[in-house]
Amino acid sequence: MIPKVIDLAAPVAAQFNLEVVGAVFQTNQSPPVLRVDIRNCDADTGLEDCEKMSRALEAVLDEDDVFPEAYVLEISSPGLSTLLTCDRDFVSFRGFPVLVQTHQPYRGHHQWIGNLTGRDEKFVQLNQKGRPIKIPREEILQVQLHDSPE
């Protein structure tokens, strides 16, 4: 059920320049609650974003009859994520310690820890103890904030 909700919600979110970051259906409440978390990659996610998404997604879910019984739809922001996914994240957290994980070993390592210095079309750049590191974006599985550089 949740994968279908995400499949329906993603194009709705894209219309408003939003991203769906998760969904959960809480059946322990009466009526059950469908919570969809969204994020605006261009600005802080605000109440207006949640309202627009709620109205538009409600219409899509009702039309598709995903939930035949009564439910409550909640749209919210997940808050600060440790994963860096959009350009805004890479600008906001420049200079912060990050952990970069790669699909395959890159130069013998699956993980790289250092201070984020930038990201462009081809590379994510780190400073690792004064040494610049460039990791090709196609090699990267994920980039996340890290507690402290090694």
From Swiss-Prot:
HAMAP family for this protein: RimP (MF_01077)
Record's keyword annotation contains Ubl conjugation: no
Key words, A-Z: Cytoplasm, Ribosome biogenesis
Family as reported in the entry's similarity comment: Belongs to the RimP family.
Gene3D superfamilies: RimP-like superfamily, N-terminal
GO BP term, example: ribosomal small subunit assembly
PANTHER family, alphabetized: RIBOSOME MATURATION FACTOR RIMP
Predominant location: cytoplasm
GO cellular component, one term: cytosol
InterPro entries: Ribosome_maturation_RimP, RimP_C_sf, RimP_N, RimP_N_sf
Protein name: Ribosome maturation factor RimP
SUPFAM superfamilies: YhbC-like, C-terminal domain, YhbC-like, N-terminal domain
Function comment: Required for maturation of 30S ribosomal subunits.
